[in-house]
UniProtKB/Swiss-Prot annotation:
Disulfide bonds: none
HAMAP family named among the record's database cross-references: SmpB
Segments for region (Disordered): 140-162
Underlying gene: smpB
Function: Required for rescue of stalled ribosomes mediated by trans-translation. Binds to transfer-messenger RNA (tmRNA), required for stable association of tmRNA with ribosomes. tmRNA and SmpB together mimic tRNA shape, replacing the anticodon stem-loop with SmpB. tmRNA is encoded by the ssrA gene; the 2 termini fold to resemble tRNA(Ala) and it encodes a 'tag peptide', a short internal open reading frame. During trans-translation Ala-aminoacylated tmRNA acts like a tRNA, entering the A-site of stalled ribosomes, displacing the stalled mRNA.
InterPro entries: SmpB, SsrA-bd_prot, SsrA-bd_prot_CS
Protein name: SsrA-binding protein
One Pfam family matching this protein: SmpB
Keywords recorded for this protein, A-Z: Cytoplasm, RNA-binding
Sequence intervals crossing the membrane: none
Subcellular location: Cytoplasm
């Protein structure tokens, strides 16, 4: 299983389970919101072991509710008979105002809801950060990569010479 990493050194209870690093490269994130997620017991235990992937998933507003679609949570080995479905749709908990904001955002051309990080907060509750994003064109992706490479090169030069 994947290793669960602690995101903050000051708070050992804040644990990142899955991160969609590709989303920041493929999309321009306009805003993000923390949402609760409804899980079954075996899903929570599997998440605590680090068995999750949100890279191919997305969020959708359907019938006045927010759903996480195509996210993968590995089966929990000790839950033999009460096993959860690995790629089921999971309901996200969000306020009505944020839900209407998400609905309005997705109605604009090219906008989508992308999961960014799945983690346990300081109270031990599973949370997911959803971003309102617009897909980048190929030249935008190249520009982002060039800026990232230049900043790395600058930091190397400053470290070596300064």
């Amino acid at each position: 299983m994947a290793q669960v990493k602690s995101s903050s050194k000051s708070d050992p209870n804040y644990k990142v389970v899955a991160e969609n690093r590709r989303a920041r490269f493929d999309y321009a994130i306009e805003s993000d919101v923390e949402c609760g997620i409804i899980l079954e017991g075996s899903e929570v235990k599997s998440l605590r072991e680090g068995g999750a992937n949100i890279a191919e998933s997305y969020a959708a507003v359907e019938d006045g509710e927010l759903w996480l679609v195509n996210s993968y949570i590995a089966p929990y080995k000790q839950a033999k008979t009460f096993q959860h479905e690995e790629r089921r749709r999971r309901k996200l908990l969000i306020s009505r105002k944020q839900l209407s904001d998400f609905w309005n955002a997705t109605q604009r051309k090219g906008m989508t809801l992308v999961p960014l990080v799945l983690y346990f907060n300081h109270r031990g509750m599973a949370k997911i950060k959803i971003g309102v994003a617009k897909g980048k064109k190929l030249h935008d992706k190249r520009e982002t990569a060039a800026k990232r490479d230049w900043s790395r090169q600058k930091s190397r030069l400053m470290k070596d010479h300064g």
